[in-house]
Amino acid sequence: MADSIIQSPELGDVTGYLRERIRTVPDWPMPGVMFRDITPLLQNPKTLRVLIDVFVHRYMDAQLDLVAGIDARGFILGAIVAYELNLGFVPIRKKGKLPFQTVAEEYELEYGSATVEIHADACKSGDRVLLVDDLIATGGTMMAGLKLLERLGATVVEGAAIVDLPELGGSKLLQDGGLPLFTVCKFEGH
């Protein structure tokens, strides 16, 4: 799957510009994994602005009501995008981190399972929501977020992430599950 090329008069290939600034950490958190570290994008004010602008320009006319972000790096991207679009932000958290009544969704990991939660009053029926995370690997976390939002009556307009690892099957799982997906760049491998 080739990256879709996002062009800018000032930067040229924005996709390539951002992709080149994502650090690859071999064998972390375990041998054989090539960890795609987005923190260099966040640390530099220019790359952070370019990254946020990509999402803002994509969604500024999407008639959204909310942006939901997945714990933890999806909070960073999602909250900034929500602010720039003048929308509210909904955190989707790991189990036990939200103080009010919650709705939960369990999902499978490579070795076991995990649970994410959302406040029961986080959105209402008919809300149009953008669902954001930093990276799509197996797709389990974003699929769980999708199910939570839909259970509360929201329509998830699109899932969005900085990085897609298509060989792990997550983007296919999400698209096959009916979720349109936008990612800034793709990397081969794990």
Curated annotation (Swiss-Prot):
GO BP: any one term: adenine salvage
InterPro entries named among the record's database cross-references: Ade_phspho_trans, Adenine_PRTase, PRibTrfase_dom, PRTase-like
Name of the top EC class for this enzyme: transferase
Keyword Glycosyltransferase in record: yes
A Pfam family hit: Pribosyltran
Subcellular location as annotated: Cytoplasm
Cellular component terms (Gene Ontology): cytoplasm
Gene3D superfamilies referenced in this protein's UniProt entry, alphabetically: 3.40.50.2020
The entry's keywords: Cytoplasm, Glycosyltransferase, Purine salvage, Transferase
Pathway annotation: Purine metabolism; AMP biosynthesis via salvage pathway; AMP from adenine: step 1/1
E.C. numbers: 2.4.2.7
Reactions mediated catalytically: AMP + diphosphate = 5-phospho-alpha-D-ribose 1-diphosphate + adenine
Primary location: cytoplasm
Subunit structure: Homodimer.
Family label: Belongs to the purine/pyrimidine phosphoribosyltransferase family.
Function field: Catalyzes a salvage reaction resulting in the formation of AMP, that is energically less costly than de novo synthesis.
Protein name as annotated: Adenine phosphoribosyltransferase
Origin species: Cupriavidus necator (strain ATCC 17699 / DSM 428 / KCTC 22496 / NCIMB 10442 / H16 / Stanier 337) (Ralstonia eutropha)
Gene, per the UniProt record: apt
